[in-house]
UniProtKB/Swiss-Prot annotation:
Pfam families: His_biosynth
Active site: D9 (proton acceptor), D131 (proton donor)
Protein's UniProt keywords contain Isomerase: yes
Enzyme nomenclature, EC number: 5.3.1.16
Chief site of localization: cytoplasm
Gene3D superfamilies membership: Aldolase class I
Name of the protein described by the UniProt record: 1-(5-phosphoribosyl)-5-[(5-phosphoribosylamino)methylideneamino] imidazole-4-carboxamide isomerase
Compartments it resides in: Cytoplasm
Gene: hisA
Organism of provenance: Staphylococcus aureus (strain JH9)
Any GO molecular function: 1-(5-phosphoribosyl)-5-[(5-phosphoribosylamino)methylideneamino]imidazole-4-carboxamide isomerase activity
Pathway this chain belongs to: Amino-acid biosynthesis; L-histidine biosynthesis; L-histidine from 5-phospho-alpha-D-ribose 1-diphosphate: step 4/9
Family note: Belongs to the HisA/HisF family.
């Protein structure tokens, strides 16, 4: 069964959503992060909560550590955190604070030797966030181009004990227009590492279609704030 991971994105300790990762598209969510934690925690079908420090992702260092540490105390659900994680000490600090999994993006993509070291040090607890426009990978809060192809890059990661690869189609993110099913399905076939889909998810039908592609988990952003998404789920 595909896992459901509702998302909380933070700017200045406020729960927000962006469209296509553009910081000038910031939209404050109706629920605070604390309220979202409580809301998501009531559902047995929620396997973990996905938290991102958006300013950390852009500024290249974690900005919301203390606030995220306070959120950790509000739920027994697993929590994964990403955004600005660039060092082993940051990862260890998050784990010491009770965070279950850490997400690395830019650092892991630009330094695969470091990524391998972290994954072997914390097997199954490190997730790599791979964000792309089409097949072109972006880094540093989605603001910097790379010359890396999504599939070529992911294929070289097969021997690394990552918890999974979080794939975000930037063009879909925040739009609730549906995930990029085609590229997501191709990515699942290109790697033995579990693939987590993020970006554009609207409703349970999208989840069911992702499940049919053997996607391991789905990260739900804006849709998770709508009661209609959770109808019939426990």
């Amino acid at each position: 069964m595909i896992e459901l991971w509702p998302a909380i994105d933070l700017i200045g300790s406020t729960s927000v959503r962006l469209t296509e990762g553009k910081y000038d598209s910031e939209e404050k969510m109706s629920r605070s992060a604390e309220e979202s934690i409580a809301y998501y925690s009531q559902f047995e079908c929620v396997n973990r909560i996905h938290i991102v420090d958006l300013i950390g992702a852009k500024a290249q260092y974690a900005r919301e550590f203390d606030y995220i540490k306070s959120l950790r105390r509000l739920t027994t659900k697993d929590i994964e955190v990403g955004g600005g994680i660039r060092t082993k000490s940051q990862i260890m600090d998050y784990f010491a604070a009770g965070i279950n999994y850490c997400i690395v993006g830019t650092k892991g993509i630009q330094d695969t030797d470091w990524l391998k070291e972290m994954a072997h040090t914390f097997p199954g607890r490190i997730y790599l966030s791979v964000d792309a426009y089409g097949e072109d990978i972006k880094v540093n809060g989605w603001e910097e181009d790379t010359e890396l192809n999504l599939f070529s890059f992911v294929r070289q990661l097969s021997d690394i004990p990552l918890g999974g690869i979080i794939y975000t189609d930037i063009a879909k993110d925040g739009k609730m227009s549906g995930p990029n099913f085609e590229l997501t399905g191709q990515l699942v076939k290109a790697t033995t590492i579990p693939v987590i889909a993020s970006g554009g998810i609207r409703h349970q039908q999208d989840i069911q279609r992702l499940a049919s592609l053997n996607v391991h988990a789905a990260i739900i952003g804006k849709a998770a704030h709508q009661a209609s998404f959770w109808e019939g789920l426990e």
